[in-house]
Amino acid sequence: MESKPSRIPRRISVQPSSSLSARMMSGSRGSSLNDTYHSRDSSFRLDSEYQSTSASASASPFQSAWYSESEITQGARSRSQNQQRDHDSKRPKLSCTNCTTSAGRNVGNGLNTLSDSSWRHSQVPRSSSMVLGSFGTDLMRERRDLERRTDSSISNLMDYSHRSGDFTTSSYVQDRVPSYSQGARPKENSMSTLQLNTSSTNHQLPSEHQTILSSRDSRNSLRSNFSSRESESSRSNTQPGFSYSSSRDEAPIISNSERVVSSQRPFQESSDNEGRRTTRRLLSRIASSMSSTFFSRRSSQDSLNTRSLNSENSYVSPRILTASQSRSNVPSASEVPDNRASEASQGFRFLRRRWGLSSLSHNHSSESDSENFNQESEGRNTGPWLSSSLRNRCTPLFSRRRREGRDESSRIPTSDTSSRSHIFRRESNEVVHLEAQNDPLGAAANRPQASAASSSATTGGSTSDSAQGGRNTGISGILPGSLFRFAVPPALGSNLTDNVMITVDIIPSGWNSADGKSDKTKSAPSRDPERLQKIKESLLLEDSEEEEGDLCRICQMAAASSSNLLIEPCKCTGSLQYVHQDCMKKWLQAKINSGSSLEAVTTCELCKEKLELNLEDFDIHELHRAHANEQAEYEFISSGLYLVVLLHLCEQSFSDMMGNTNEPSTRVRFINLARTLQAHMEDLETSEDDSEEDGDHNRTFDIA
């Protein structure tokens, strides 16, 4: 991830070197000190779990003010503003100086500061030298060792700030765990710290007399105590992660009393547990967001089929217990006693909300208790059936298979053939029959019979299928005169989702459930023979030629006038024997205009005999010759245009050659080109004469 340079929101506190400069600072910033000490957005919190942010500015080190929690309430704001000048010489300027660090891995285990304004609004500093370091288990051991050593120094700082009673702190405490959706970072076991890999720079501390709390070496950077140094030794390469400086007006105060406070171990363990919980919440939110973005209906269905078969070995199982399974106290493999699994399974709500009609199982427990289905044995015996994508592509194949297996799958004996039932079947080794009568009065009486039939159809010990019962009563009564048959893949078991392709075979009401065949007596009646006889007679009357007379084979009309009589042009007989004169003229003209040869025009297409035509004012040979001349002229014009273009190109090339050289060979080439064009024109004229005589209009142009 490419880091982007951004400015770190921080607070700069100035350390005056004398009381005069301190008064000038407090006088000029009288109103801003209250905002500095008591602003909500920039307040720090000294928490039981200290989180460090070792940051550096490449130009100059920045100092962030360090505050500890105290019992001062909000009313102390005005008191601190009024008394800040009086206690200027008594109040220690305790500040945290963040320097460029080369030992950031040890600094991350100690005092940790957390600014709610920078973390809450996701304004994490992204400078080019920032590296997000994640520490492993070896740093966890080092953290426990260093926490024992830093308790004394931390308590010393806390007591030192508490001794100055006028030092008012912010009463606003930031939230324990910021919201992950707003970009805040969790306080986890990974102990992510911000380490700036900048080169160590020379810093000259601004005060003449100051006390520096520095680490002795890079390993024990947080075992520190206050030591006084002179101003000439303040110029140094600051490699420790933090240096704590406090100054008074007159002389430095060296605090050597180290007080040991109670161990922070219980708070750390509770914070670790809270960190684990927050991590699981984050993972669950990520999973739920990924479900709406990356999961389609088909992929979620395939993942559901896979997870339902392999839920015994999975850490978090998305299988949902139905209401009937929880009512009959049947243990499921998806029940994990660990609290982590129960919390982490919340991330798979996208699988839980896709169950279509599972809520109906609570209302129909009386029907679903009598219907059993073993999902686990079905998954082990039959194995995964076919994926939904393959079933969607092979719908006709499976429909035919269901129709062939209708005899074996229907086992409900019914005494009354007029009773209308809805049977839901599964295409597997086990067949579940659920029957619901359309008659509301006879429904209660027929339920025990359907329950007995369904229990005899299933094999082995099984769990009750409440989702099927809910769907049974929901669909009964839609089409009372037909029978529904639902085919579901066995890999899903009782978990019937709305994604599953449900094929419905609508069978006529005359279907006999005992033998699985349609009733022959209730089939559609055959056609009336008298009606068929009438149809045949009407067709014969329409085809009679005696009443209508002779018809033209082109326009199917009789002779209308003496000028347009019916003729017999060829040896065709029957209904194709007669043709109108005008119809024949039009047909021959169309054949000539199509470019057919004279022989093709004068031959019948049906009997392949030569036409015998004695038409007035219609000469086939003359019409064909005229059309051939028109075609020749058109082709000559087209070829002439082609030759003109070719001649122009030749002249241009000749002028270019004449401009370049005056050799006799170029002149000879031009003369040969002119002769070639003249010969080509003569060939065109001779080809036109031949086409008029022979009727062949296919020419080839040979250009030398």
Swiss-Prot record:
The modification Phosphothreonine is found at residue 686. GO terms for biological process: negative regulation of cilium assembly; negative regulation of DNA damage response, signal transduction by p53 class mediator; negative regulation of intrinsic apoptotic signaling pathway in response to DNA damage by p53 class mediator; negative regulation of proteasomal protein catabolic process; negative regulation of protein autoubiquitination; negative regulation of T cell proliferation; positive regulation of cell population proliferation; positive regulation of protein polyubiquitination. Residues 37-48 have a biased composition (Basic and acidic residues). Keywords: Acetylation, Cytoplasm, Metal-binding, Phosphoprotein, Transferase, Ubl conjugation pathway, Zinc, Zinc-finger. Residues 684-695 have a biased composition (Acidic residues). A zinc finger (RING-CH-type) spans 544-614. Residues 66-83, 95-126, 189-212, 237-246, 254-270, 304-313, 319-332, 412-421 have a biased composition (Polar residues). The modification Phosphoserine is found at residues 317, 389, 687, 691. Zn(2+) 2 binds at residues 570, 572, 604, 607. Zn(2+) 1 binds at residues 552, 555, 580, 583. Signal peptide: none annotated. GO terms for molecular function: MDM2/MDM4 family protein binding; ubiquitin binding; ubiquitin conjugating enzyme binding; ubiquitin protein ligase activity; zinc ion binding. The modification N-acetylmethionine is found at residue 1. The keyword Coiled coil does not apply. This is E3 ubiquitin-protein ligase MARCHF7. Residues 1-126, 157-279, 294-313, 319-343, 361-425, 444-473, 683-704 are annotated as: Disordered.
